[in-house]
Amino acid sequence: MYIEIIDIYAREVLDSRGNPTVEVEVMLEDGSVGRAIVPSGASTGKFEALELRDKDSKRYGGKGVLKAIENVNEKIAPKLLGLNAYEQVSIDKTLLEIDGTENKSNIGANAILGVSMAVSRAVANSLQLPLYKYLGGVNAKVLPVPLMNVINGGAHADNNLDIQEFMIVPAGAPSFREALRYGAETFHALKRILKEAGHVTAVGDEGGFAPNLQNNEEAIQVLIRAIEKAGYVPGKDIYIALDVAASEFYNGETGKYFIDGTEKTSDELIEYYESLINKYPIISIEDPFDQEDWDSYRKFNEKVGKKVQIVGDDLYVTNVKRLEKGIELKATNSILIKLNQIGSVTETLNAIELAKTNNMTNVISHRSGETEDTFIADLAVATNAGQIKTGSLSRSERIAKYNQLLRIEEELGDAAEYKGIKAFYSIDR
């Protein structure tokens, strides 16, 4: 099969935070067009592929992406025009060769990813296939369990909570549609509880609330109350997940973590997590330690890895080399997948495949600076990942992904599978 790329064009658009980002359009010889917009993170791992920004203080506070746009239009396009769009692996390889650096710092991961995603979409449109079916083939059928970030802290909020995300996980629902309902009803119950307690209910970057509470544990207790108020059973219908983002409160000089107003060693932090796990229906903990604290990950996984999903985000940055190290050390039993951490569709699919082969779960994820692009919804179904993180139950750039998943579930009909608790296959539940 052969279809030529005849045009590639990039432009500067805005993300959900009002910051510039890259949008790319790819046209094929039959007139099919694929468009993709690249997201952007707030708490970024130090090993992520480089997002190229202009650093021109006169435009967008230095956050413009005109250099990345120019790289697409003037460096990438001439090399890709005339190539066969069906050969995604070869195209992504060419993109990496054009850049020539380990972390994509030459032409920018945002430039490369925009093109990589747009090529996938263009081909799916040309074949008149849904994107999930083009990427995943006939076996793409698993709707993901959503990990819904309804209370924000850390780098995502201006409040006193250290943990970055407190999530509800409707793993007890019978279908994705019902899971979304469980989540939405709990979100509204949570809003009422916070309002009655005199907290501000404005939402943060990912659509969650950012109240000032006594400590991190109180946030979990409030979530439990919201689940019950919505008429659900914590630990049966809906579970709790945390994204600690511990690199954000780790002191590299002392080797200690500052959480809940005190400094803790990594062993004390493990004890703290264990006490929470024993008290509350916590099913998943992401980034519990600093991105270079491999030893603490290994210890923690050895202790609780049979009963709680331990997710590496900043630890792995969707990078196969770092994931291989994690597998060797038995550092975690799960990986967070973010397209823009690594910067191409092929490399993302390689990371997902490697994790699955080693009985690790994959959690497909958005970024805090999102857009209306729904690529990750299709990616989750394409890879049968079984889990997705795409924010709270408010803000259109988050809801866009949930709505796309509803459409996919409807389209799949009886073939659609919602694994629920079985999506957490790396733990004993």
Swiss-Prot record:
Keywords: Cytoplasm, Glycolysis, Lyase, Magnesium, Metal-binding, Secreted. Disulfide bonds: none annotated. This is Enolase. Catalyzes the reversible conversion of 2-phosphoglycerate (2-PG) into phosphoenolpyruvate (PEP). It is essential for the degradation of carbohydrates via glycolysis. Transmembrane segments: none annotated. Pathway: Carbohydrate degradation; glycolysis; pyruvate from D-glyceraldehyde 3-phosphate: step 4/5. It comes from the Bacteria. One of its GO terms (biological process) is glycolytic process. It catalyses: (2R)-2-phosphoglycerate = phosphoenolpyruvate + H2O. Its cofactor is Mg(2+). The keyword Lyase applies. Mg(2+) binds at D243, E286, D313. Belongs to the enolase family. Its EC number is 4.2.1.11. GO terms for cellular component: cell surface; extracellular region; phosphopyruvate hydratase complex. The active site is at E206, K338. (2R)-2-phosphoglycerate binds at Q164, K338, R367, S368, K389.
